[in-house]
Amino acid sequence: MIIHAGFVDLDTPTGPMRTHVYAPAPPTGTARYPGLLLYPEIYQQTGPIVRLSQQLAGHGYVVMAPEIYHEHEPPGTVLAYDKAGTDKGNAYKAATTLATFDHDAAVVIRALGAHPACNGRIGAVGVCLGGHLAFRAALQSQVLAAACFYATDLQGGILAGGTCVDTLARARDIHGELLLVWGRQDPHVPDGARAGIYQALVAAGTTFTWHEFNAQHAFMRDEGPRYDPEAARIALGLALSLFQRTL
């Protein structure tokens, strides 16, 4: 499927938020497509995130991928996959308030709903920090499904300065369906943390699918030594199955 790529600057209380838009090219008819709010890792719109966005758009989705650190960096800033970029991304993660993350999600959800190619049915997807933010986006009633890949800090951590402790506690408020995908060799979400997340979702009565690969953190990032192309292919297929079923 041919896609178009561009961006919009969405207004937020903390300034304009550059949001990258990928959508199927306009057909000759009046086709409309589901929308996806896509969250990146802590590095913003890197090459792997752009390619993931393009893949999803090519499967028939209007994808909006916001620059989550818009209040800290100018539009278009991409952090490097190195120690300096990692340190900066983690610092911004801690400095951004939970209210900002949640409000920004609502802004993108409204923009998706207003996009002329979107049919109004909206899901969320994210990797790493973005997996956590996709989970939180599902707390908003418009989000019908969320695919969360190796979501960090769900079990408690430094997101928003350590104020993320209510994410799992609010799982009962999620009325859509979740997909949670993990790597068993992920040091950021070890066995005990994954077990705690699973038990919390069961206790909350959440509708979810759970899949673990023998893979590292960031195994879907299609550059670098941790990339596992076969696991990434299967994981993306799980997400597409979720969205086809729910959106």
Model-derived regions: residue spans:
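N-terminal cap/leader regions of alpha/beta-hydrolase-fold enzymes
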Residues: 1-247
